């Protein structure tokens, strides 16, 4: 069986690629990084190492690569012949691959291919595949064919893969834990059952549990750690103040998840404890700048902080630690990160209230006032 995977970065190789290879797929990685693509073409394999005491190495074979900038026709051809298409490129990049995917679907239609195909966006976002489907639809010549044969099931993915540099451009280190959950209701290729993947009738509880626990938690450690001067997640997790803030934030999101989705309280408490242990993994040195990047996106209305705050308010539940986190994020400075620079420019040029409303989408004056107080509370002293 053939899989096309967009995104040959660490998550693509270190998570999705590993699962697909274990299930017997030949994988064509699609990326614009010529160094990685060339190495995949030449070697047709790469190595994953688990970040724990075992340092177990896993060899992933039967792979190749295509550069979608220089070889778009071959990418279209690969999609036309694929049994599965997946992505791990980042939510902001999905629209850029939509046209190529549409061309691949249209090529299947022209060849009268009557083999169902699922296209799964494995991204840190709610409804990633649904969003990708909407983008792809803009370019389709034969939408009726796509409606019949192409599925875009949403997915939730979870594995910490830190930024890393190795002499070997294909070598990747990952945490042992991984979770990939797929919405079974929107699949077309039902005959494909991936081992190591959970198929569920209702994905939303799992996506929200992951987003509001792992992503909210990871970001909490990163921004709180940055405020206290730490460089890596594992360093920050040695500080009792950071751990206390993390636990408080996850208790607040946990209240929402239990109330909304009827998760068992004790099971969810164990899930939170597992997350804390994962963040404390001394074998992973994950840069705070990686986890804290793109703060404007992370402050979005549907994202890891604002959405739980809003939904807790709707249930008359308080979220003081989440609101404190918004103040901390607004004060995050990373000159290397475009959105961090942009956010600080906005705060320099407009009133704090205006920027809060603009970035978060929050309209309630009382909540804006509360966030403003937290922005001022965590402001760094200005150096003359």
Swiss-Prot record:
Disulfide bonds: none annotated. PROSITE patterns: MANNITOL_DHGENASE. InterPro entries: 6-PGluconate_DH-like_C_sf, 6PGD_dom2, Mannitol_1_phos_5_DH, Mannitol_DH, Mannitol_DH_C, Mannitol_DH_CS, Mannitol_DH_N, NAD(P)-bd_dom_sf. This is Mannitol-1-phosphate 5-dehydrogenase. One of its GO terms (molecular function) is mannitol-1-phosphate 5-dehydrogenase activity. HAMAP family: Mannitol_dehydrog. GO terms for cellular component: cytosol. Monomer. Belongs to the mannitol dehydrogenase family.
């Amino acid at each position: 069986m053939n899989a096309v995977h967009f995104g040959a970065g660490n998550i693509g190789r270190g998570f999705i690629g590993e699962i697909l290879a274990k299930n017997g797929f030949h994988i064509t990685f699609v990326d614009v990084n010529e160094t990685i693509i060339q190495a995949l073409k030449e070697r047709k394999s790469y190595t994953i190492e688990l970040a724990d005491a075992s340092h177990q190495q896993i060899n992933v074979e039967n792979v190749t690569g295509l550069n979608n900038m220089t070889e778009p026709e071959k990418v279209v051809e690969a999609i036309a012949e694929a049994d599965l298409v997946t992505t791990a490129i980042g939510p902001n990049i999905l629209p850029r691959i939509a046209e190529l995917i549409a061309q691949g679907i249209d090529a299947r239609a022209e060849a009268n291919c009557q083999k169902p195909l699922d296209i799964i966006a494995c991204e840190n976002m709610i409804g990633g595949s649904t969003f990708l489907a909407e983008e792809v639809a803009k370019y389709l010549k034969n939408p009726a064919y796509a409606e019949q044969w192409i599925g875009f099931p949403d997915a939730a993915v979870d594995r910490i893969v830190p930024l890393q540099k190795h002499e070997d451009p294909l070598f990747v280190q990952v945490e042992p834990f991984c979770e990939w959950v797929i919405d079974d209701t929107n699949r077309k290729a039902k005959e494909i059952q991936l081992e190591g993947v959970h198929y569920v009738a209702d994905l939303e509880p799992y996506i929200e549990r992951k987003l509001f626990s792992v992503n909210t938690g990871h970001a909490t450690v990163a921004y709180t750690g940055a405020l206290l001067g730490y460089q890596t997640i594992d360093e920050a997790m040695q500080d009792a103040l950071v751990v206390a803030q993390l636990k408080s934030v996850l208790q607040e999101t946990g209240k929402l998840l239990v109330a909304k989705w009827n998760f068992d309280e004790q099971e969810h408490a164990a899930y939170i404890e597992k997350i804390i242990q994962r963040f404390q993994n001394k074998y992973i040195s994950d840069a705070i700048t990686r986890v804290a990047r793109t703060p404007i996106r992370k402050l979005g209305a549907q994202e890891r902080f604002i959405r739980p705050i809003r939904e807790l308010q709707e249930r008359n539940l308080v979220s003081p630690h989440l609101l404190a986190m918004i103040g901390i994020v607004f004060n995050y400075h990373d000159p290397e990160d475009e959105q961090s620079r942009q956010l600080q420019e906005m705060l320099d040029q407009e009133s704090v209230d205006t920027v809060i409303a603009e970035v978060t989408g929050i309209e309630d004056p009382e909540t804006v006032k509360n966030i403003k107080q937290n922005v001022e509370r965590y402001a760094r002293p200005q150096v003359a």
